[in-house]
Amino acid sequence: MTTTTTFKGVDPNSRNSSRVLRPPGGGSNFSLGFDEPTEQPVRKNKMASNIFGTPEENQASWAKSAGAKSSGGREDLESSGLQRRNSSEASSGDFLDLKGEGDIHENVDTDLPGSLGQSEEKPVPAAPVPSPVAPAPVPSRRNPPGGKSSLVLG
């Protein structure tokens, strides 16, 4: 007499079958051809990661209000924010004179020691410092951030 094995499906109590694969996490990936309303987790920024903490904790200096001043790392935060702004402007092709922005940040930093009453320090010259990020030349064709595009436009 011949024995026939029956296929049981995704029943958790059945024996493991090589025909049915369950996704990690134990859910079922069985579909009858129509989309069931499943709730996707909503993330504000798909590039955000919880490695660095929540986005509210790690706001850039340009996102902070002008009245809130941190104690020590304000200059570093402002320079990193300025570099991010420079890189976004370089990718868009719209170049602005960044020396004026650098002067504004320097004036804010040079006014702080005078307001604290430390007259022992030497006065800092207000000479403009060249920006560390030089604007890149505008390419004749733009490629997407990931590499080359197969789309040819003239």
Curated annotation (Swiss-Prot):
The entry sums up its family as follows:
Belongs to the JUPITER family.
Q: What are the protein's UniProt keywords?
A: Acetylation, Cytoplasm, Nucleus, Phosphoprotein
Which residue intervals are annotated with compositional bias (Pro residues) in the record? 125-138
The keyword Phosphoprotein is assigned to this record: yes
Subcellular location per the Swiss-Prot or TrEMBL entry: Nucleus; Cytoplasm
The UniProt gene name for this protein comes to JPT1
Compositional bias annotation for Polar residues: 1-19, 47-59, 80-91
* N6-acetyllysine modifications at: K148
Comp. bias regions, Low complexity: 60-71
Q: Which residues carry this modification: N-acetylthreonine?
A: T2
Q: Coiled coil: which residue ranges?
A: none
Q: What is this protein called?
A: Jupiter microtubule associated homolog 1
> What species is this protein from?
Homo sapiens
Q: How does it assemble?
A: Interacts with the complex composed, at least, of APC, CTNNB1 and GSK3B; the interaction takes place with the inactive form of GSK3B (phosphorylated at 'Ser-9').
Q: Which residues carry this modification: Phosphoserine?
A: S28, S31, S71, S80, S87, S88, S92, S131
